[in-house]
């Protein structure tokens, strides 16, 4: 018996973009991405126990730092308590280039383990524009029903508009396409998302 491949549906939002504008943000997808994420938490003592209880896949301090330094990167998100950041900073070369370095601005440097782990496991994603002004975002699986995919697309669209730089003029999102992992892209009428 073969297992059917459930393709990820990605949204590609074309934005009117100047390279001087830093286009990035965070959005909570109402129906998640459909992907089971692995979370690594750097914490000690009570916060480590809290992270384990909240559902973190990997929790530790110096032992996990050494494991990552040896090349292990089998996780999707990294969270750290503020007191661990001095040591986690040593992993900047490894985590930074993969976009996994914990940052206070993204909420991944925190003492609220229960809150951040709940967000990460329920469909919170970070997005940023590439050099050409396109934001690429996973919006769910092809097995999702159309209303779930539409809700997720609207959430991303509204988040991008909310994070619009103040000096951006005119229409900010100028096009949207969706494509599955192994499917052609389809243009979406963004007027229906407004």
Model region roles, listed by residue range:
Residues 1-49:
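Translation machinery proteins
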Residues 5-9, 163-175:
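Flexible, glycine/charged-enriched surface loops at secondary-structure junctions
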Residues 51, 96, 178:
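Residue-level signature of catalytic and energy-coupling elements of molecular machines
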Residues 58-161:
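Long, charge-patterned amphipathic alpha-helical coiled-coil/hairpin "stalk" segments used as oligomerization
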Residues 167, 187-194:
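Intrinsically disordered, compositionally biased charged tails
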């Amino acid at each position: 018996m073969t297992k059917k491949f459930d393709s990820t549906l990605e949204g590609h939002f074309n934005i009117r973009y100047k390279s001087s504008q830093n286009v990035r943000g965070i959005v909570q997808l109402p129906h998640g991405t459909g992907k089971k994420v692995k979370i690594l938490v750097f914490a000690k003592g009570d916060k480590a126990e809290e992270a384990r209880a909240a559902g973190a896949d990997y929790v530790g301090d110096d032992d996990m730092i050494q494991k990552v330094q040896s090349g292990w990167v089998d996780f999707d998100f990294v969270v750290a308590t503020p007191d661990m950041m001095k040591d986690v900073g040593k992993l900047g070369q490894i985590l930074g280039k993969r976009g996994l370095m914990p940052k206070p601005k993204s909420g991944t440097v925190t003492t609220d383990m229960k809150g951040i782990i709940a967000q990460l496991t329920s469909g919170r994603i970070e997005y940023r524009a590439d050099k050409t002004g396109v934001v690429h975002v996973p919006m769910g699986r092809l097995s999702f029903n159309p209303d779930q995919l539409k809700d997720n697309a609207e959430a991303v669209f509204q988040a991008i508009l909310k994070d619009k730089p103040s000096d951006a003029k005119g229409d900010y999102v100028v096009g949207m396409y969706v494509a599955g992992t192994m499917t052609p892209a389809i243009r979406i009428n963004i007027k229906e998302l407004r």
